Amino acid sequence: MKTYLKTPTSDMTVHEIRTIVKETIKWCQDNLGTKCYGVDYSVRTLGEKYTPAYGMYDYSKRTILVFRNHAPTVKCVVRSVLHEYAHYLQNLRWYNHVLQKVGYDKHPQEVEARVVETMYSICWNDIKNKI
């Protein structure tokens, strides 16, 4: 089956989603840079008691998490990985302090991550033949 940005993740296996995440991270490493330590990733199902999110970056575990039950399309998966990879590159030491002062939508690190997200079509054009 050919995979497109609009392909529903509900039609995909976890392995297929993991491949997209892995290739997106490789693209990020080549095009956005890395840190002295690497980043891991995991594709999971987010429990119902949690606030819905496409993904998150776990700073303490240096892991990008993608929640397949909340990222409905391949486009959402790629955008989520780009967004969370931006957080991996950022210094998050004062993240929570700034979050309390300005909120999520105006947080400078969230604004920056949303800008990185917009690179999804460039990323997808580079990785789609590896999926």
Predicted regions and their residues:
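Long, well-structured alpha-helical subdomains associated
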Residues: 121-131
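Active-site scaffold of zinc-dependent metalloenzymes
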Residues: 44-75, 92
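Hydrophobic or amphipathic, alpha-helical segments that drive membrane association/targeting
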Residues: 1-12, 39-50
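Post-HEXXH active-site segment of zinc metalloproteases
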Residues: 75-79, 91-117
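Short active-site segment of divalent metal-dependent hydrolases/proteases
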Residues: 82-90
